[in-house]
């Protein structure tokens, strides 16, 4: 007897659902790369999950649910359960004497042994085959019990044997009408009163359990059928049908049709009257006239001449007129100019501005001139203009350095006027020399800083090297 090396993971989990299962050893025994991938992430009573580990775990759960995942069975007790069942089936097969039943049961045992000899076995298949074996064996036992209880007398003796009838309380008239003894081969049926009938004795038989089909029965399913020589004679008798009650014997000829859901039936047509049939018939049609049909027909309409009946031709088109000769004489240019000037003046008077004239020029495609600022325009504050330019991010122009003192005095003279808009820059122009000196000092300071920076960096490097040497010496 060869023991199995693998078993179903689903069966193992169902059998050990109340036991504590260690995740590490369990995943090492399960066959498949998914279980090994998840088992590598198990350690220190914790599981480290990433995307790949979760996908492998879901695939393993799907295989376990579909009963396609297997695991190693190290203990021999886990695989000896089916072999013990197989031994019990063999013991039951020894007592089977019928050749047909023995052949069918032996084929089931051969299929179970073939499944147990392979390395990978599905417990569901073995359980289905075991159920088929016990089902066929129960059928064989039920047939054997029925055959053992049938009488062994000859057919002639069976016809002379009468079945015992139970004594039922019948009225005296019925008991008097019954014969004293009726042979079995000629039964005489007597109709008892309503709802009272006799039932023959039925032979005791074992209750046969209903055959329950399995969910994965093989295609070569077999059904045990006994041979003709072992067929059991049917000794059952159907009880007589009780007579109909009194209220059902006489059924009315017409059935009520006014029940709910019944379709109404149209009444039959009334019968013909008993009077003479000729009086009720319609009068005959009038006879045709005896005159000639051709003379009675109206004459056809006269033929119309198509040439005379055509509509008249359309009228001729109007004559062509020369546009040059038909145009009116032009109006005097002087009068035309006066009218245009009057219209423009009226438009300017009504509108109050030159917008209409500007629009007309734009429509005519003329090049417009730039508008000249008005002489009396309000003066703008230079400070506000400067601030607005700074806010807008415009680049300010640099001040021109005045080298000649005479030019500076001339500028001051030009600026120092009675106009208030020009006297605002007086203070700024007088401080030009001081501003230029400050700019020169700022440039000298930047040059000094630029020259000192390499020296400072060289000094810092020496100090850093000295510090590192001191640290090493310490």
UniProtKB/Swiss-Prot annotation:
Keywords: Repeat
GO MF annotation: an example: actin binding
Organism ancestry: Viruses, Viruses incertae sedis, Naldaviricetes, Lefavirales, Baculoviridae
Protein's name in the database: 61 kDa protein homolog
Superkingdom to which the source organism belongs: Viruses
Family annotation (SMART domains): WH2
Compositional bias segments (type: Basic and acidic residues): 227-237, 434-460
Function field: Probably plays an important role in the persistence and survival of the virus. May be a structural component in the envelope of the polyhedron or the envelope of the polyhedra-derived virus (PDV).
